[in-house]
Amino acid sequence: DLDPDDLSEKIRAHLDAHGYGDIGIEVLMNVTSSTLSVQDPLAKAGIRVLEDWGIEPVIWPRKGASGPPGYFSTLLGLNVLSSTGIGHATGHGSPDEFLVIEGDGKVGGLIELEQSYVDLLYSYANYPNEY
């Protein structure tokens, strides 16, 4: 649960303590991280969709980067489920971001990704009942 402002201050203090006061720090953006309990209804709805698709969920409680999930979670006060869906993509907001467009039966593509999002909306709207 790192606070971006607190972290910036700690980095500044560390640099100063080691004789690097001449190094400037320019914060371009600071976004808090987000986390969601696997017991949260949104997470359970997402897990249910993956299992219904025959996919064993891989759960990462935290990601190694900040980004839109943390921003919108803080801004709107909502729980955010990130990096979910059928298909393969990674690197959101980075120069090497990608998304598989056409699945090959082993890896889902854009159509499967979109359908899994629709399933997630239905699953969450009806949770804990069947969707």
Predicted regions and their residues:
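Long hydrophobic segments that form regular secondary structure
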Residues: 1-3
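Short amphipathic alpha-helices in soluble, non-transmembrane regions
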Residues: 7-15
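Generic structural marker for isolated residues within well-ordered, non-membrane alpha-helices
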Residues: 12, 46-47, 69
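Short secondary-structure junctions
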Residues: 18-22, 50-56
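Flexible, glycine/charged-enriched surface loops at secondary-structure junctions
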Residues: 20-26, 126-131
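A short beta-alpha structural unit
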Residues: 23-39, 62-64
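Short, low-order "capping/linker" segments at domain edges
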Residues: 34-52
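Zn-dependent metallopeptidase/amidohydrolase metal-coordination segment
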Residues: 55-127
